[in-house]
Amino acid sequence: MKKRIRSSYKVGSSNKYHKKNYTDNEKDKKKYRSYKEKHINEKMFDKKEFLNFLTNFNKKFMKKNSLVDHLMKMNDKAEDNYDGYNSSGSRYNNINDDGVELCGTKRYTNNKNNSDYDNYNNNNNMKNKRYSNKKHNNDNIIINNNNNKYTDERKYRNKSIKEDVDYTNDYYNIQLNNNKINNNQTKNKIDTIRNISHEKLGNNKSSSARNLSLIQTSHIPYDAPLADFLENGRFLRTFENISLIGQGGFGSVYKVSHRLEPGSPTYAVKFIYLKVSSLDNVSSRRYFREIAANRDIYSKHVVRYYTWWCEEPQFLPMHLMPKEIQNLVKKNKDTFKKRLTKNKKYSNNCISDSSNNNNSSCYSASSYNSSINSNYRNMKLWIKKKEQSPDMKRYKEVLRKNNAPNLVFYSDNDGLTSKNKENPEKNHNPFLSDKNFSDSIYKKKKSHDYNSSSHKLKKRKNKKKKSKKKRKSKSKIKTNAQGIYEESENDEGRDHFQYKKGKEQFSKFIGKLILWVLHKVSKNMILLIMVILSEEDRDLIVFADNEESNGNDQQMIRHDNMNNENVIIKHRNEDDKNGLDGDKNGLDGDKNGLDGDKNGLDGDKNELDDNKNELDDLLMKQKINSLTRNDIVNIENENPAPHATNNIKNKKVDLNGELTYYDYVGKNEVIPNSRTETNVESINTNGMFNNKFSVMKDEGGEYKKKENMTWGDTKRDGLYENGKHEKDGLGVNKCITNKYIENDDDDDDDDDDNNNNNNIDERKKDLKKKQKNAITKGNEDLLATNGTNNKEKRKKDDDINKNMEKIKSYKKKTPVPEFSIVLLLQMELCKGYTLRKWLDRSTRSDKPLHFTYSDKKMNHPLEFDLFKQLIKGLKDIHATCFIHRDLKPENIFVDNDTYTLKIGDLGLVRFIEEKKREKDFNNIDCYKDNIYTDINQNRITSQISIKGQIIGTPGYTAPEGGALCDEKADIYSAALILLELLCPRFTTIMERYKRLNDFRNYYTVPDYVKIHLNPWYILMLQMSKPNPADRPSAADVYSKIKVLLDPHLTDFAFSFNDIHNEHMNKPPQGTNNFERITDNKDKFVIQSVVDMKNKVENEEIPIEKGLNSNVENIKNENNGADK
């Protein structure tokens, strides 16, 4: 329970969500800091004791107390809602609901509720006695007797229930009997309660809306920062809705009357619908700019904002809310509505139809018993499933135990031949994939088979782990010369074979034999069997290194496509190498020839060219991971043979000596290797590969990989110890680089490694001398530049990776639940209408220079006076360091009676930051704005009011616009409003739009404005300059308007009767602030009164003497016209 509806804010910086004095209550707290909060402890306040006290008080004094009846109803509704029953009279439907409480499936009686019910009956008796003197004495006595009998029977039955052991059966039997006997009494009580409630709702709609007991509670957590801003129910308590004023992008505004203030004054309340998370601080939203600005602005020409608060939608009258919010509530899309449906599970079932069924009740024994039993059974089943279900973390082990005998070892041709495909039921697919990883696909065997196989699996796994630690490379079987099988490797390093040709019967026999042996013998003992078997049969042995394998990666490949497939060949030991046929012996001879003498390379190439057709079936394609201009080519092969170059057509080398790309024969696929090191073959002048080198660095007895190395980096690190730059027939530089590091073979290959290392050491000495002569100074410069370029690329890559990690972490943030709230702003109610309606009214003239005049004794037109008030309001707004940013006639209000102007709708208000403003405008080139072009696309519009809309209204915004605008943007908008005031009424919207657009782009105005209203035209040009720094401030404009509207210059004012004498019967006494000096009526010379006034002040001559001659001339020419 929340302690308070409205929480108070501590004054100080310690509070994280500190909000400055937005309301009157907080202003009082700021002044009088001695105010201390006192919270009511609800445990100390017992409702039952209070109700007992009131009933006893009524018994003694026998006086009518309406508060008692209201509290009794409130208490009944609260208890019914807590128990999950209907809030409208369900207490009286079930007779034994008060005496029995349900806790799961156990039921027990409570004596305290009996006393409460007796108190309620006593209260009813007292009520009946009150009205006994008036009417219906006999009826009341009968009802009282029935109630007394009912209470006695109920007490007796409750005592009998306590003595019984089986609570459930007695409870249901008693409930059935009570429903049969007292059904008529309960029906009468329900009908009376419903009738009374309907009468109240029909007579008093406002009272029902204000009854907070009918409204749901708040669903926002009380600990959330959002709860500090809530004042649920404040609108219904203090205001009464009258009518809708208007709706816009920021919300809807209603005219309301204040109930609590004397005279019930009227205000305007704006409703703004927000979707906010529980952790969001509402005061940081853009809507609160309007609140913060109006809190400090006290101006006659600015709409005042009094206070603000937040409420949840369910606490507000729904007819005031927009249709969007009403639809959300109806469709249960909001979070608070979902919780309401959970609390009202049984509300629909609790409503009893008394007119149709006489023997019905809220909960019949049969329906209630069936619902309880079904729920209880479901709970039992759920508990059993939970107990029987294994730990989900070990689900893989459970599946492996069930599928163990089918998945341990398998023959290579089982499930792959055409015969097996024809009979899928008999011969199932042995390969384990993600799709068929279930018990339904593999047939189960007996339980003892599962246990025995799973126990053996664990032992095998432990042995495999030990063997993997000892061995650095896994053992793999060489292919047969006849091409019966070929070995391939999938992405996870698992081994499988691909069937190629005949001998099906023999392979099945060998496969079954291996399965039987592997159940009995460990994996390491199979090496003995390999010695016994022949060379052809030795290839049929299959090692299942991992029980899991992807069936999608293991597919049949025919003999026709073998030349195009990638095969990895690794040498187990020297015995396997010598065991190959003549073709393989030829390869070993070629390798020994390369190790013995460097000069034998040419001869080896010729021999390999002769045997090219015979070796195509067993050749290996070199796999390349990355080919870049500055990086080394990575070839995923540990021991490549020199004859592998026959599959490569073209080998191109960059000018820097780097491998750029290769053209391969056949299909290119990168096969990842368990050993992650980069192996590169060096190139001879004739295009042959020399011995391999690995870009590795020996540190502490271990080799560490050097990735993305360039020639410059390898030269600097000393990795490339030897290299050649020679030219072929085309003049392309090719590099020979040789570096040898010990191969990672088994313990049996140590002798071969020592022999190879001796040969390597001899070659290093010879090639070092040649490398020094080959590298020139020009090549060294190229290597250095490449090294620096790679550093810059690495930095860029690192920055990109960091940014990607930040983006991923941002996307992975857990979403916070959002709640719907309504922000309410209490504002000053402006009488009249907007300036837009005032300008477009039908009584306004559509002819030039036909201005309006008020009833007051005013020397100038009303349009000029309204503009003066507008500039005064902007001056007050800018003085408090705020910018309106959305100044237009729609946001300006005019009173019909007093003709006072007020600026409203500060929803886009912004704080002025002078330091940022000066820096920003120095870097911006201002330009003219054209609505029809795409010039506005370059504007900075980071602070957007509505989705997809530029700040402010496009027709009145300044050219700079966006987030960098300052208070001079309001001056630009005021200049356009002045132009609209000087022009007559526009007949169409397009005419107004064209007039404003011409001024924005070309500064064009009508001729009568230039000639007859020249000072105002000059003022408009100054206010609408493209550079904001050149525009005058609001204070400067206000001072200039004062001079133009100076009442001392009325004697020399120009009258509109001189121009349009035939259209005006009575010329008004007004000013256009000009002096007309004419010799003839056809010639007009306009002279500014401002210049005349300055001359008079400088010469220190009175105005009457200085201009006496001019006045006399004007009077003579105009024949007694008004001054």
Swiss-Prot record:
From the UniProt entry, list the residue stretches annotated as the region Disordered.
1-30, 409-493, 572-609, 742-800
Q: Which residues form the Protein kinase domain?
A: 678-1049
Q: Which residues carry this modification: Phosphothreonine?
A: 953
Region annotation (5 X 7 AA tandem repeat of D-K-N-[GE]-L-D-[GD]) ranges? 576-610
Extent of the sequence repeats: 576-582, 583-589, 590-596, 597-603, 604-610
Which positions are annotated as binding ATP? 245-253, 270
Q: Which GO terms describe its molecular function?
A: ATP binding; eukaryotic translation initiation factor 2alpha kinase activity
Q: How does it sit in the membrane?
A: Multi-pass membrane protein
Biased composition (Basic residues) is annotated at 455-477
EC assignment: 2.7.11.1
Q: What is its EC class?
A: transferase
Active site, UniProt feature: 886
Alphabetical UniProt keywords: ATP-binding, Endoplasmic reticulum, Kinase, Membrane, Nucleotide-binding, Phosphoprotein, Protein synthesis inhibitor, Repeat, Serine/threonine-protein kinase, Transferase
The record's note on quaternary structure and interaction partners says: May form oligomers in response to stress; oligomerization may result in catalytic activity. Interacts with BIP; the interaction is disrupted in response to stress.
Q: What does this protein do?
A: During the asexual blood stage, phosphorylates translation factor eIF2alpha in late schizonts resulting in protein translation inhibition. Plays a role in trophozoite differentiation into schizonts.
The record's section on PANTHER family has: EUKARYOTIC TRANSLATION INITIATION FACTOR 2-ALPHA KINASE 1, EUKARYOTIC TRANSLATION INITIATION FACTOR 2-ALPHA KINASE EIF2-ALPHA KINASE -RELATED
Return the protein name: Eukaryotic translation initiation factor 2-alpha kinase PK4
Q: Which gene encodes it?
A: PK4
